[in-house]
């Protein structure tokens, strides 16, 4: 089973190279990531944006623009829409946000004519490689859905399972994270967790095992699960951590990022093609890992 981003990248390189359309590509950190992604055999790219600005940045960072197709579109909104259209028409396999605000970019992703909407809930999946655990940790949703209800959580679980399957985890273990591991009518997230677990038992959620509610320590650690007397397929062995809300997810994401020696990458899924939506605060390595993750999911339709 794949346990690291190096292994993810090796798996991506063993397949046909995918192509990412970069929306408003005149962004130095994004161009550096795209340059190195192609150099390392992870993904090719189509750069959509202001041609002259792209070339100027490319010269600054030692990037040979002749290695990439550039679509000149100085208008930010039109460039974002064009990048998405390249994916929906099959000329690229995934789309990546460049120097454009998130709201404008997502409006293009959800455009009724050329967008990537599927009718399902879009969600963000962050994948972490840590020294402490012998498996990859999938966090969802840490960036997109604020207070998902049961219907959205079903889609969020299915989206994350799709990513896990692409990586090679055949039957991922999903833990709906709550403050406690018992059902409490005053804590709605525990009720959702119980319903998701029963749906998994009945085969309504497929390709994974869902068991909850589970507190974070019990989902992560077999030792903690043993001490608290919690048993089951997921306790202490969870792959996917379903967050009850965006605050919990965002705090956990940033805690792992800034206080542990970890690596991560993340993508938006629930769309007809993967969406790379990184933050300017994300490291170069995180951007590269996110492109690799998107390429792997794009190749596993």
Swiss-Prot record:
Pathway: Lipid metabolism; butanoate metabolism. GO terms for molecular function: phosphate butyryltransferase activity. It comes from the Bacteria. It catalyses: butanoyl-CoA + phosphate = butanoyl phosphate + CoA. The keyword Transferase applies. Its EC number is 2.3.1.19. Coiled coil: none annotated. SUPFAM superfamilies: Isocitrate/Isopropylmalate dehydrogenase-like. Keywords: Acyltransferase, Transferase. One of its GO terms (biological process) is butyrate metabolic process. Gene3D superfamilies: Isopropylmalate Dehydrogenase. Belongs to the phosphate acetyltransferase and butyryltransferase family. PANTHER family: PHOSPHATE ACETYLTRANSFERASE. Catalyzes the conversion of butyryl-CoA through butyryl phosphate to butyrate. This is Phosphate butyryltransferase. The gene is ptb.
């Amino acid at each position: 089973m794949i346990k690291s981003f190096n292994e993810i990248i090796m798996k991506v390189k063993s397949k046909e190279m995918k192509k990412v359309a970069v929306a408003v590509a005149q962004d130095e950190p994004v161009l550096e990531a795209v340059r190195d992604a192609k150099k390392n055999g992870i993904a090719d790219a189509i750069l959509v944006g202001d041609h002259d600005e792209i070339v100027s940045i490319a010269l600054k960072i030692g990037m040979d623009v002749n290695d990439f197709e550039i679509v000149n579109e100085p208008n930010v909104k039109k460039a974002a829409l064009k990048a998405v259209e390249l994916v929906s028409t099959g000329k690229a396999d995934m789309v990546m946000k460049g120097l454009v605000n998130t709201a404008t970019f997502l409006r293009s992703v959800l455009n009724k004519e050329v967008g990537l909407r599927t009718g399902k809930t879009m969600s963000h999946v962050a994948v972490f490689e840590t020294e402490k655990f012998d498996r990859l940790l999938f966090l969802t949703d840490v960036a997109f859905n604020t207070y998902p209800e049961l219907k959205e959580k079903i889609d969020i679980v299915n989206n994350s399972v799709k990513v896990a399957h692409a990586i090679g985890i055949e039957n991922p273990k999903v833990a709906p994270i709550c403050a406690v591991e018992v059902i409490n009518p005053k804590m709605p997230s525990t009720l959702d967790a119980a319903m998701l677990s029963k749906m998994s038992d009945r085969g309504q959620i497929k390709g994974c095992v869902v068991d909850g509610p589970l507190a974070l320590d019990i989902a992560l650690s077999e030792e903690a699960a043993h001490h608290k007397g919690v048993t089951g397929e997921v306790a202490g062995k969870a792959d996917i951590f379903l967050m009850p809300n965006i605050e919990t997810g965002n705090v956990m994401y940033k805690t792992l990022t800034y206080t542990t020696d970890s690596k991560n990458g993340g993508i938006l899924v629930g769309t007809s093609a993967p969406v790379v939506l990184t933050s300017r605060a994300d490291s170069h390595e995180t951007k590269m890992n996110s492109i690799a993750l998107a390429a792997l999911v794009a190749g596993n339709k």
